[in-house]
Structures are given as structure tokens and as C-alpha cells.
Amino acid sequence: MEMKEKIRQKFAERFGGDGPMYVAPGRINLIGEHTDYNGGFVFPGAIDKVIMVEIRPNGTERVNVVSLDMDGEDSFGLTEEERPKTHWAMYIYGICREIIKRGGNVGGFDAVFAGNVPTGAGMSSSAALESCFATAINDLFNNNEIEKFELAWPAATPRTIIAAQTAALWTSLYRSLAARTT
């Protein structure tokens, strides 16, 4: 079964019904890793590995997320300072918090995601995850009124929240490749 079908099946099983799907590519830096935040040059490119998410507003102030790759589930609130329990959900939490902080709208949602971007291999699986969710939230809760360039900043911030490391802007700029899919 393909990734998309697995996501659709789990979403229907866990939350009932369906929602729109979004996809974002992983990336490589053709001239080496870690050069961006060390003041060096970058030459990034998208790859054929992706993160895909099915997501739907749930009419609450809670975010409920299932990760097929991590075999896990997490939930957190939007109105209180309740952090997720899992490391991977911190990226989604960071996106939500930063969009709200910058004046955007975020409501509760249910989501299931999976991907084939290798984790820990320098192909930006976390950036692809952030990109998917930032694009989906912009579409579902802000009518795509947040410009792609502006959306790059909220997508960069979760790295600061999680790893106390400033994300480089170029890593975030490739997020403009994220899109709604059918």
C-alpha cells in the first residue's frame, strides 16, 4: 500500500471521514551540511522524498496528531502552554505557536502524517514536516493570506524551540515547494 493510501486509511480509522492532503519535499545541500548557520554558502535542492499529511479542522482548541513513521500519537492545546509529549510533535507545536504569535489564525485540528525522507541523514525531514504543517495551517485557517516568504519564519522557529539552534533562512525558503495535493 502506498504512503498516501496508508495515511488516508489511518485518518478515516482514527478521526473518521477525510481531509485535504499536503506534501513537502526533503532537500539536500549540494555543497555540504552545516554551512548555513556557520556563515557559509548554500546550494540547496529538493529531492524526490517527501512528507505527506492529511489534516482537518476539528472545531476545538486541541491538536491531535498521528505519526505513522514514529508509531505514535500526540495531542496538545492551543490556548494553554501545554507542550506535546513527543519530540516530533514539538515541530508542529512550534509552527502553531509561531503563527499565532505573528498574528495568524490556528484552530484545533486532527492530522495523520508519514514520509519517506530519511531522518538524521541531512535531508531535512523535520523541515519538510514543518513545511507541510505551515502550508496546511495557512490554507485551512488563514485562507493562504500569509505570504510564502512570511511563512518561512514561523517554519524556522520550531528548530529554535526544540534544539536551541537558529534555523537558517535558506532552509526555510525551500518550504515554498510545499503544496496541497489530491
Kindly label every feature range from the protein language model:
Residues 2-127, 131-148, 154-157, 162, ...:
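ATP-binding N-lobe of GHMP and related small-molecule kinases
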